[in-house]
Regions:
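Boundary at the C-terminal end of the N-terminal hydrophobic targeting segment
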Residues: 21-25
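Metzincin-family zinc-dependent endopeptidase catalytic domain
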Residues: 46-168, 179
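Eukaryotic intrinsically disordered, low-complexity regulatory regions enriched in Ser/Thr and Pro
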Residues: 29-30, 49
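Bacterial N-terminal signal peptides that target proteins for export
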Residues: 1-9
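Fold-level signature of zinc-dependent metallopeptidase catalytic domains
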Residues: 31-45
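Metalloprotease/metallohydrolase-associated module, dominated by Zn2+-dependent proteases
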Residues: 135-164, 180-226
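Bacterial N-terminal signal peptides
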Residues: 10-17
Length: 226
């Protein structure tokens, strides 16, 4: 794990910009029409992508696909000399990918760059939207999730990286769908890579049932065959 222990404890995972506060009901959830993982040219460590896609396809009703994306970032998007401002990145990503998919496409940009928010030293992932919005997007930084250098092609620890990203993306999908349950099981809020690695990769029973009823999760995990 890179970074000091102090920074690790200060890290926040998957900060949702819009969170519903009303009591949960199946009718309030929206299922994605598809889940798209966008891969910029700068992301050269990609061995984790295939197992990530396979894992998501096993549990999600919606199809999951990857998409190459030409995207660049200007200096005014920097939060520090070595970190991008996650809000500026997400806003830019939303504009670049706006013509791809539909309002119910859940779109995720996988970046090798470190991200920062205004109040946190760094973030692993952030998502924007909920069941009421016409956008559902997320940004995931593999800078600290990749066990090697994400800007260099390598095979080291691909399954570890895939599982870390899987937990973040699956939690985000549930939140963007409108799930407002407490932070528990996969929805828990780790503050370090160790906590992320140790936390469950599954939903608690009540949340799992709500997501199945809403058509977000499959009733039984299985390969989709696509």
């Amino acid at each position: 794990m890179r970074g000091s222990a102090r920074d690790a404890l200060a890290a926040a995972l998957l900060v949702a910009s819009v969170m519903p506060s009303a009591a949960q009901s199946v009718g309030s959830l929206v299922a994605p029409a598809e889940v798209v993982l966008y891969l910029p040219a700068s992301l050269r460590s990609r061995d984790f992508v295939d197992p990530l896609v396979c894992a998501l396809r096993r549990v999600l009703v919606a199809p999951v696909r990857t998409q190459e994306l030409g995207i660049s970032f200007s200096r005014d998007m920097l939060a520090t000399p070595s970190q991008l401002d996650v809000d500026k990145v997400a806003h830019h990503f939303g504009k670049v990918a706006t013509d791809d998919g539909t309002p119910l496409s859940f779109k995720y940009l996988l970046l090798p760059y470190d991200l920062k928010s205004t109040s946190l030293n760094y973030v692993f992932a952030t998502s924007y939207g909920n069941q009421t919005t016409r956008y559902h997007i997320g940004v995931v930084s593999t800078s600290r999730l990749d066990v090697g250098n994400p800007r260099i092609a390598h095979q080291q620890g691909a399954m570890v990286t895939a599982m870390r990203v899987y937990k973040l993306v699956l939690k985000s999908i549930a939140r963007l769908a409108g799930l407002s349950g407490p932070e528990r099981c996969i929805l828990s809020f780790p503050r370090s890579l160790d906590e992320l690695d140790q936390k469950s990769a599954e939903f608690c029973a009540e949340d799992h049932e709500a997501l199945i009823a809403a058509g977000v999760l499959k009733a039984e995990e299985r390969d989709s065959g696509d």
